[in-house]
Design a protein with these regions (language model features):
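Bacterial extracytoplasmic/cell-wall-associated proteins, especially those involved in peptidoglycan
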Residues: 1-126
Length: 126
């Protein structure tokens, strides 16, 4: 999944930062700021629309608070190593899309399948 994010950063069809790629998708203004018409745009709060973003773990509506600190620390270490050292880069052969094996998204047949890792299938543009 991290390799897909990094592949998208390098693809001009997507934002050119990791956070930009992860947060890509429609947003809506929070009720906390929407009620104030005179509030400047820079102070408004926007949230991803649930289940409408590119990466479901960003907009699933669940708390982002880590409850398993050991797993969270390991995930951070892997992400840092991946970004800094390039370890595992290319493992998805340039994939810009993926999905779990238990779903069948309508976009899947329009892309080239490049592989499977665990319970995820990876694709790239033709």
């Amino acid at each position: 999944v991290a390799d897909v994010v990094l592949n998208r950063v390098l693809d001009t069809r997507y934002p050119n930062t990791i956070c930009g790629v992860v947060k890509d998708g429609p947003v809506k203004e929070s009720w906390k700021t929407k009620q104030y018409s005179s509030l400047p745009d820079s102070e408004r709060i926007y949230n991803p629309i649930r289940h409408k973003c590119q990466f479901s773990w960003w907009c699933d509506g669940r708390s982002d608070t880590a409850h398993d600190t050991d797993s969270w620390m390991k995930a951070q270490e892997i992400a840092q190593r991946l970004v800094q050292s390039g370890k595992y880069r290319g493992i998805t052969e340039g994939a810009t899309h993926y999905h779990a094996t238990y779903v069948s998204p309508r976009w899947a047949p329009t892309l080239d399948q490049v592989g499977r890792i665990g319970s995820h299938i990876f694709y790239r543009w033709n």
